[in-house]
Amino acid sequence: MTVPIPTSTEQSSAPTRFFIPDTLANWPWPRALNPAYEQCKADSAAWCEKYKAFSPKAQKAFNLCDFNLLASLAYAHLPEDVNRVGCDLMNLFFVVDEHSDAMDKNSVHVWVEIIMDALRNPTKPRPDDEPIVGEISRTFWENAIKCLGPTSQKRFIETFETYLYAVIVQADDRDHHVFRDVDSYMVVRRDTIGAKPSFALLEHNMDLPDDVFNHPLLEDLRTWCIDMLILGNDLCSYNVEQSRGDDGHNIVKLVMLQENIDLHGAMQYISDMHDDLADKFLRNYKNMPSWGQPIDEWVTRYIEGLGNWVRANDAWSFESWRYFKYDGLRIQKERWVELLPPANKEDLTSSSE
């Protein structure tokens, strides 16, 4: 889509607002919400809060972000027990993300080893002196394996480990003040966004053979979906991140630097990128070869799940408090966003926005 040009006054001085393109105006998957959302939210929130991973003030901000809503939008058509696992997973992701954002590379690596040991040994008690993320991870997986089939479990463990090691790379970039070019950023971000383990839940009752799962077209569809999630996430998170001086791992900032363009130009550039990805996905998602039943039905459901994930991420970005606080629904409709001023030190240390 064409991004509206700011007024002449805004162009001649520092911008005070920007326009978020409606990248999903023609996306065929409608918003849907799992009917078990409220129950899963209550249960998952109680599970997560009992570990006291955040200060009371940060926990309040964390709850307002409602990561259970994200899961219930993304897994709208899955059974309640799988949706509950999805809620727990989103909460686990953001416990890891929020804490690792303040860690150096070596500290993140320690966490990664703890988390993976907990996932591989869900019945083994965790050491008393270990960071609480170990027990959070253990109990998450202890519950998840009750409703995820063997193939789903295998893919989850493999891709969650890949996600964690990408978080180490992100921490290393942060330690060394690295600003990546767009292509290398996308390579790392495809793993740090956590989409691949999230997609493993779509396979909860499937047994897709590796040759089907790794078919080049299905690989492409997965990558195009992930890239749309990245662009959509970074468009919505940019304002908060630039105000915190934490936009070095956001494609908006990287496009501005790489292409030497302003914020408006970056929004248009990213909108065009997203349009290209959506076009490729929609032109190809019905062109998978046939392997016979039940594989064809599994592949169809899996791809439908990918398409729904794109809509879910967009809907949550505006309905949640995380990026726009109480102004999300207006911004979703009107698309104009007021640029936030630099956050003060108290804002950065007292909440986990």
Swiss-Prot record:
The keyword Cell membrane is annotated on this UniProt entry: no
Gene3D superfamilies for this protein: Farnesyl Diphosphate Synthase (1.10.600.10)
GO biological process: isoprenoid biosynthetic process
Residues where Mg(2+) 2 binds: D97
Record-listed Mg(2+) 3 binding positions: N233, S237, E241
InterPro entries, per database record: Isoprenoid_synthase_dom_sf (IPR008949), Terpene_cyclase-like_2 (IPR034686)
Binding residue positions for Mg(2+) 1: D97
UniProt GO MF annotations: metal ion binding; terpene synthase activity
Description of its domains: The DDXXD motif is important for the catalytic activity, presumably through binding to Mg(2+).
Protein name: Delta(6)-protoilludene synthase K435DRAFT_659367
Organism for this UniProt entry: Dendrothele bispora (strain CBS 962.96)
